[in-house]
Structures are given as structure tokens and as C-alpha cells.
């Protein structure tokens, strides 16, 4: 399964989904698997009740989600990564970062 497959499945269950994939460098297989696992966790936490999911992969990995009552909080992930959470209108921006990195909005 690929990120494109996951995006198609989300569309099939009624979640508006976009995938903007233009990394500035090659992503290792471990990072791609972490991105997919993180997306799966986001969907499960929101009980698949989302209006939209925008996935942006460039120099950072960002998930913008809308339409959930679930509160997302920043947390550590495996492999020395963390998920930085920002509240945005109608949802959240979740940014996958190396531990210790911070992105200013």
C-alpha cells in the first residue's frame, strides 16, 4: 500500500483528501513508513470522522485535518521523531519533525 492508495481510500469513505508530494531530497523507507503509520494513527484517533486531510511532503511533512472534535496534542514518535500540533481554523496542523526541531507557523 502507498500514500496514494491511502489517499484514495480516504476519498472513498468521504474524506476530502489531497496529497502534495514533492520532497526536496530522497525520503528513506523508514521515514515513508513512519509517515504512513502517523497518518493511520491520526485517522484512528479521529475515528475516521474527518472532513478533510491535506498531506504535504516537502522539506517538512505536514498533515492538515479538519472536521474533528478530537483534540490532538504534540507528542513523541518512534525513531527520534515527534508530532508538533497547531490549532488552525476548523482543525489542526500536525507536523512530523525530528525530535528537538520546531517549525514556526
Task: Annotate each PLM feature.
Residues 20, 54-56, 84-86:
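Solvent-exposed beta-strand sheet faces enriched in polar/charged residues
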Amino acid at each position: 500500500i502507498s500514500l496514494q492508495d491511502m489517499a484514495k481510500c480516504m476519498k472513498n469513505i468521504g474524506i476530502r483528501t489531497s496529497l502534495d508530494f514533492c520532497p526536496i531530497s530522497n525520503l528513506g523507507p523508514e521515514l515513508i513508513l513512519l509517515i504512513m503509520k502517523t497518518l493511520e494513527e491520526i485517522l484512528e484517533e479521529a475515528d475516521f470522522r474527518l472532513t478533510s486531510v491535506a498531506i504535504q511532503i516537502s522539506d517538512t511533512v505536514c498533515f492538515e485535518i479538519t472536521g474533528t472534535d478530537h483534540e490532538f496534542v504534540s507528542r513523541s514518535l518512534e525513531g527520534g521523531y515527534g508530532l508538533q500540533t497547531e490549532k488552525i481554523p476548523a482543525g489542526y496542523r500536525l507536523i512530523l519533525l525530528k525530535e528537538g526541531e520546531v517549525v514556526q507557523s
